[in-house]
Swiss-Prot record:
It catalyses: Endohydrolysis of the N-glycosidic bond at one specific adenosine on the 28S rRNA. It comes from Momordica charantia. Transmembrane segments: none annotated. GO terms for molecular function: rRNA N-glycosylase activity; toxin activity. It comes from the Eukaryota. Inhibits cell-free translation in a rabbit reticulocyte lysate system. Signal peptide: none annotated. This is Ribosome-inactivating protein charantin. Monomer. IC(50) of translation-inhibiting activity is of 400 nM.
Amino acid sequence: LRNVEQQCRADALVERAQELIHGQQ
């Protein structure tokens, strides 16, 4: 079930990216 692990990491990266985007605005 490494796919789940990768998906969780991807979700975390997306959340960080969204935070950075909101922070710039």
